[in-house]
């Protein structure tokens, strides 16, 4: 009997497992305990007594917990700047809101501590202020979860609740980058017989017009095709937005994002705007309403086949708009 219920391989969870192992060694409770083990405990306790109110110290002592599990102090962050990530995760702040300029945290200067493990010149004199701010919200957290009986396990669970979305966001970003690279590689294959030069972020091809055509990675839109009219003077031809997310329920939000990018591209003179998606089902009528600037919608899956109606349409249009003849038949 053939089983009709088939699930995809849990690749993302496998990736998460390895990422979580790395997180535990750098940002989670394991890293904190390893750091404290090699520190001068007297110096640490002196600062904890200075930064943490007596009632909170007493509450933690009741449960046999050291205060640094919840409260950061300068000597600790100076010993291991990566631990800023632990306290950020524990308080439930995403990287975007904690370090972003538009959230009002004023914590952007500390990002290198979590990301690179070093304290910048601007951040160094503000470490004390950072710790006071953390200790204030940590006190609120301690009071708020008090009825649940505070424990190391609970604190570890709270950090993991913030890690999850961060890992998923990282996976989504990676999926997005992979999708852009895949579409770029497909274009590269289509024009390979006319390539004049391959650079890290661009392909230069010889067109039938005698002018160079550049196919490039770009920040917004994702891929652009431009024709060089003269030195440093280009005709903008094609703007391509790649939306690699596989969540069907979210695809129309992504198409809305593509529309914003294409509107900018139109403003810069691009004559063709394409949107490449990575979902199996797409309501084309709805998609066209959400992105009227998109001339053509393509599927990453169909393009990856290197054959079929969508791929052939994509191939013909790339060749036509770059003024390149088709590759000779072997």
Swiss-Prot record:
Keyword Membrane on entry: no
Catalytic activity: Endonucleolytic cleavage of DNA to give specific double-stranded fragments with terminal 5'-phosphates
The entry's keywords: Endonuclease, Hydrolase, Magnesium, Nuclease, Restriction system
Pfam families given in the database record: RE_XcyI (PF09571)
Record keyword ATP-binding present: no
Major enzyme class: hydrolase
Cofactor(s) listed: Mg(2+)
GO molecular function, one term: magnesium ion binding
InterPro entries: Restrct_endonuc_II_XcyI
EC number of this enzyme: 3.1.21.4
Biological process, per Gene Ontology: DNA restriction-modification system
Family under the similarity heading: Belongs to the XcyI type II restriction endonuclease family.
Protein's recorded name: Type II restriction enzyme Cfr9I
Gene name in the database record: cfr9IR
């Amino acid at each position: 009997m053939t089983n009709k219920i088939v699930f995809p391989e849990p690749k993302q969870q496998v990736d998460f497992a390895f990422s979580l192992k790395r997180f535990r060694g750098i940002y989670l409770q394991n890293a904190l305990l390893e750091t404290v083990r090699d520190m001068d405990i007297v110096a640490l306790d002196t600062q904890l007594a200075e930064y943490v109110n007596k009632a909170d110290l007493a509450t933690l002592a009741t449960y046999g917990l050291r205060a640094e599990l919840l409260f950061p102090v300068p000597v600790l962050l100076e010993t291991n700047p990566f631990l800023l990530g632990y306290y950020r995760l524990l308080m439930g702040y995403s990287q975007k809101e904690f370090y972003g300029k538009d959230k009002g945290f004023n914590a952007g200067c500390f990002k290198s501590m979590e990301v690179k493990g070093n304290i910048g010149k601007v951040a160094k004199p503000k470490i004390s202020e950072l710790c006071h701010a953390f200790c204030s919200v940590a006190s609120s957290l301690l009071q708020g979860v008090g009825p649940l009986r505070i424990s190391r396990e609970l604190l570890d669970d709270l950090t993991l609740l913030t890690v999850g979305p961060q890992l998923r966001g990282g996976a989504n970003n990676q999926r997005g980058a992979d999708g852009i690279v895949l579409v770029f590689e497909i274009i590269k294959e289509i024009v390979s017989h006319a390539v004049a030069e391959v650079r890290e972020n661009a392909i230069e091809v010889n067109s039938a017009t005698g002018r160079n055509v550049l196919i490039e990675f770009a920040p917004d839109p994702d891929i652009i095709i431009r024709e060089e009219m003269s030195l440093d003077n280009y005709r903008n031809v094609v703007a391509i937005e790649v939306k690699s997310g596989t969540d069907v329920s979210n695809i129309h939000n992504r198409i809305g994002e593509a529309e914003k990018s294409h509107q900018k591209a139109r403003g810069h003179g691009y004559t063709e705007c394409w949107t490449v998606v990575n979902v199996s089902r797409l309501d084309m009528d709805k998609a066209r309403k959400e992105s009227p600037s998109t001339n053509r919608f393509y599927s990453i899956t169909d393009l990856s086949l290197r054959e079929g109606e969508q791929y052939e349409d994509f191939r013909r249009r790339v060749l036509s708009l770059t003024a390149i003849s088709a590759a000779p038949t072997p």
